[in-house]
Design a protein with these regions (language model features):
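Hydrophobic beta-strand residues in large extracellular and virion-surface proteins
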Residues: 4-6, 37, 61-63, 88
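Short, glycine/charged-enriched secondary-structure capping and boundary segments
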Residues: 19-22, 52-55, 76-77
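A general structural signal for alpha-helical elements within enzymatic catalytic domains
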Residues: 27-30, 89
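Short, flexible, glycine/charge-rich loop motifs used to bind or transfer phosphoryl groups or to couple energy/partner
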Residues: 28, 50-51
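Thiol-based oxidoreductase modules, predominantly thioredoxin-like and allied folds used
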Residues: 31-47
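Structural micro-motif
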Residues: 51-63
């Protein structure tokens, strides 16, 4: 299984949406239930430096360091959910 990393920012409504989508995907699909997501706060975590220049918006999700999903302003929960599913499928 590949490593999933999520970059977030405290107070970001799209990040909250992504966390809800992750919870929903893990509950709905048994094969994703035990998958772990490394969470990195872009402002308060030194590990965020490893991702500089690879994204603009948060949340952004990476598989083994490669960006697979980046939210955009105005993104709906449905869009987020589809993208989170895509990330989890790609990480298997």
């Amino acid at each position: 299984m590949k490593k999933i990393t999520l970059l977030k920012m405290q107070g970001c409504p799209y990040c909250a949406q992504a966390f809800a989508a992750i919870k929903e995907v893990k509950a709905e699909y048994r094969e994703f239930a035990d998958m772990e997501v490394e969470i990195i706060d872009k402002k308060n975590d030194e590990r965020a430096k490893d991702f500089e220049g690879k994204y603009y918006y948060v949340p952004s999700m990476f598989i083994d360091g490669e960006k697979v999903y980046e939210a955009h302003p105005g993104e709906t929960y449905g869009e987020c959910l589809l993208n989170v599913k895509k990330v989890f499928r790609a990480a298997i």
